[in-house]
Amino acid sequence: MQINSNMDKNLAKAMNKVSLPKRSRSYELCVRGDALRFAKLFQESVRCYLDSIMIDRNHQEAYFGLATSYKYLNNYPKAIKTLKKLTEIDDKNDKYFYELGVCYLSDGKPAEAIPHLVQSIVINRENLEAQIQLAIAHELVDESELSLMIYNKLIETNPEFLKAYYNKAAMLMGLGDFEEASKTFFQLIKRNPDYYKAYLGIAMSFDKLEKYSDAIRYYRKFLELKSFSEDALFARQRIKELKEIIPAKKEPYLKLI
């Protein structure tokens, strides 16, 4: 009984000696900045992050929050400058290089984005979003073959990553290869039959290929899933126009008969 009593006393003494470290002023300002940023008060959050960094020049969370706020304010040059500072502090964090690449893309500088996105992937091969953004960057600098290679590799190694199918198909449409685009969209809806944008992509591809009956069918399938979307008006209007085109295309054959 005495043994247990002594143990309790010793435990109580030890607990009295344990105290949680006080949060620094820099940390508190960063937390406040995060709260303002989550509330979409980006300009207000910038001030908190800057004050936090003034106290602690190596506060990574404050730098990242600051860069994110600048990005949402469309102030990409400042976001880029802040992220570059972050990569100097920690050059092993794939997230920092990824965001740096994204900001360069958003600032209309895809060539500058490429090396940072590559570095993000080198650090973390599982960063699928970085690979998608890298493909987009290559497409924007007229390196569509490299984009296609990236999309095909993503689809091969991560068949459930649906964004790779959609982006590949959209790129093929931009290149005028509507046949291959439609095939890729079909692969996508095989994976997810509710991916409504794929039906619109198929319809538009068939439309461009002058397969109007098929186009109408897939415009309707799109409308079944998204009858109140922004693109629904276009789909309905196009169905109406194609219904008028189809009889006109058949008319010459009727005259021959």
Q: Predicted regions span which residues?
A:
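Long, contiguous interaction/recruitment modules in multidomain scaffold/adaptor proteins
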Residues: 1-28, 38-40, 47-65, 72-74, ...
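Terminal, low-structured helical/coil segments at or just beyond the last alpha-helical repeat
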Residues: 2-18, 216-219, 223-257
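Structural signature of tandem alpha-helical TPR/SEL1-like repeats
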Residues: 8-11, 39-50, 72-85, 106-119, ...
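Start-of-helix register in tetratricopeptide repeats
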Residues: 27, 61, 95, 129, ...
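Position-specific recognition of the canonical hydrophobic site in helix A of tetratricopeptide repeat
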Residues: 30, 34-37, 64, 71, ...
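Canonical tetratricopeptide repeat
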Residues: 31, 65, 72, 99, ...
